Every structure is written in structure tokens, then in C-alpha cells.
Design a protein with these regions (language model features):
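Serine-hydrolase-like catalytic core of hydrolytic proteins
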Residues: 1-136
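Substrate-access "cap/lid" subdomains that shape
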Residues: 66, 100, 109-180
Length: 180
């Protein structure tokens, strides 16, 4: 999902693709609260804008544009493939302005996509911070909080029943202007 996973898992092994002459690049992105917590309304502009996991993927695509040809790849023929949460992530990614002209084809496998409204993302973020004892605007406490605490409260957030069965999702925003 958007909570855990890695580009180094067995399903992300590109050996078989490489044997067929395909340049295969696997990546990681921030997940869970670190990738999708929306904090700007609670802490001000520039702090936790949400969608950091998506922005990570855009940076990977920019890297591919600059470097694919060095590995025999074609930067004008980039296909994204994702399984489960990775499939959902690439669906969100291609709905962003930042991915324009960086992606040419997508293969989302077994990953339906969901995004949340800014208001819902703000409610979830506010609850998460309250649950771990951080007051809005207390940036020092937030910075000292180990990120491993956020997965521990994931079930509490889902129990709120605010909408999606997943607490940390991409957010519809200026960078992702419509629901994929």
C-alpha cells in the first residue's frame, strides 16, 4: 500500500527485464505519514505539504530523463509499472502536473487508486498529531518525534472512519489537481 514496501523486494527484481534488453530502474519513495501527512494548515507554508511520496517519484523521473541514455535507455519511452500500492502510486503520479512529459506509458497492476481531499488530509494529520501529543505549530516537537511512531497509530486513524480505508494517501492539491 502507501504504508510499506520497497523497490528492493523480490517483485521489483528487474533481472528478467534486463535479459530482454529492457533498462529497468527501481526506486523507493516516502510512504505512510512521512510521505503523505499534510501539515501546512497546522504548521504553516513549506512544512509537510503532503504528497511528498509523489514528489519523490517526480524526482526519480527527472533523474531518469537526465540519465537513462547513459544506461542504454530511451528517456522518451518511459514506462512505469507498479503492483498494489505501487500501481495506485503511479496512477496518482500521472495525474500530476509534475509528471507531464516524463512518463509515456503506465502499467498499474492490482492497485486501484484513491486520493483524498485537502480537508480530509488535514483532519487525519491533526488527529495523528493530537494522538501523539504534538500541538499545532510546535515544530520542535514534530522534528524530535521519531517517524516510527506514526505506523503505531495507523489503526487509530483508520478507526476514525473519515472516508478512505487508508489513512495516508495522496492528496488532491495544486500539484495533483484531479482525482486519478
Amino acid at each position: 500500500g502507501q504504508i510499506s514496501g520497497s523497490g528492493s523486494e523480490a517483485l521489483s527484481d528487474g533481472t528478467h527485464f534486463a535479459k530482454e534488453g529492457v533498462v529497468f530502474i527501481s526506486n523507493n519513495r516516502r510512504l505512510g505519514a512521512e510521505g503523505y501527512l499534510y501539515l501546512e494548515e497546522l504548521f504553516g507554508d513549506g512544512v509537510g505539504p503532503g504528497n511528498l511520496g509523489i514528489l519523490d517519484q517526480i524526482e526519480v523521473l527527472r533523474w531518469i530523463q537526465r540519465n537513462a541514455s547513459k544506461f542504454g535507455g530511451d528517456p522518451d519511452n518511459v514506462t512505469l509499472f507498479g503492483i498494489s500500492g505501487g500501481g495506485a502510486a503511479i496512477q496518482a503520479l500521472v495525474s500530476t502536473e509534475g509528471s507531464k512529459d516524463l512518463v509515456h506509458k503506465v502499467i498499474p497492476q492490482s492497485g486501484g487508486h484513491s486520493a483524498q481531499r485537502r480537508e480530509l488530509a488535514g483532519q487525519i494529520s491533526e488527529f495523528a498529531l493530537r494522538r501523539i501529543g504534538i500541538k499545532p505549530g510546535d515544530i520542535d516537537s514534530l522534528q524530535k518525534t521519531p517517524w516510527r511512531i506514526f505506523p503505531e497509530i495507523y489503526e487509530d486513524i483508520e478507526a476514525l472512519g473519515l472516508g478512505s480505508p487508508q489513512a495516508y494517501l495522496p492528496m488532491i492539491s495544486e500539484s495533483m489537481p484531479f482525482h486519478p
